[in-house]
Amino acid sequence: MIISASTDYRAAAQRRLPPFLFHYIDGGAYAEHTLKRNVSDLSDIALRQRVLRNMSDLSLETELFGETLAMPVALAPVGLTGMYARRGEVQAARAADSRGIPFTLSTVSVCPIEEVAPAIQRPMWFQLYVLRDRGFMRNALERAQAAGVTTLVFTVDMPVPGARYRDAHSGMSGPNASLRRIGQAITHPHWAWDVGLFGRPHDLGNISTYRGNPTGLEDYIGWLGSNFDPSISWKDLEWIREFWKGPMVIKGILDPDDARDAVKFGADGIVVSNHGGRQLDGVLSTARALPAIADAVQGDLKILADSGIRTGLDVVRMLALGADTVLLGRAFVYALAAQGEAGVANLLDLIAKEMRVAMTLTGARRIADIGRDSLVNLP
């Protein structure tokens, strides 16, 4: 299959992956309306073309939390990334490192912190949930600090797991799920050989290290359901703010009032996000929510955004709507599943190329030049 655009990787991933894994990353909550709108609302935003602007010294570089990024992009935390390629978190982290951007390790990664951090040169970020087991949370924070993690991404939009009906149909969950997954693996020999056989152990590395026993795919959904904490409030985050000395980013903000609360709390940044449409169907797309949030808190903290970003044009659109940096989730997992580390590196090259074209034709020589006046009409 020829890969010529950043969006080509989705089809390549679907061909390679067993259905339970493809639909787990590809799907969303309920009827998936928000999932679809994340993409469509962003693609509907019109950029303002400018010409004869002397764009010969264009640069994608930006600064974030004291780090220099080659472009305003980071890889988002994605659970079970290590099931999409052999030791997938390590491969994705290496690709991000080679392209000068941060990689964010998920709490529910296959590869543990101690395996991923030594594989790269630049410090990685780490994502954490609020869980009933506060001992695990403290243990994870201590291990992250010991591994040299600089930035903590704290996900707050998952006090309960979303209703992801596609998972039950695909075999990730539901009746006879284990047998269905085995059958799917048999019919996808490339994945079965690369990941199923040589990508072991298939457990949740960060959790298994803490518990002292394997926590595999069979335990994943049950562990999530029993450990997410619906009683969470801003007060529950205070000890984490005191404990964590580096930048702390609150992920899962969709409302300006919550963004203002994050400022009061002392967060260094927020991620405007609806969890990729995987939590509550029917909420605003990130593209629709971002402008009002930027108006409310821009300048008080750093604004990151995810959900619906598939191309370099999408990155530029999000920056114009008010983001300082974006997170790529599904897009990099598709590339990882299709071509491993090389696929993620190539995806980032394609996105950088698409950004350069968009910036050249909108008259933005620097990332700071991208703003509301880069758009024809706001949504």
Curated annotation (Swiss-Prot):
Source taxon at top rank? Bacteria
The answer to whether UniProt assigns keyword Magnesium to this entry is no
Q: Which residues does the UniProt record annotate as the domain FMN hydroxy acid dehydrogenase?
A: 1-379
List positions binding substrate.
Y24, Y129, R164, R278
Needed cofactors: FMN
Q: Which CDD domains match?
A: alpha_hydroxyacid_oxid_FMN (cd02809)
The places in or outside the cell where this protein is found are: Cell inner membrane
Q: What is its EC number?
A: 1.1.-.-
* UniProt name for this protein: L-lactate dehydrogenase
Q: Recall the taxonomic lineage recorded for the source organism.
A: Bacteria, Pseudomonadati, Pseudomonadota, Gammaproteobacteria, Lysobacterales
Gene, per the UniProt record: lldD
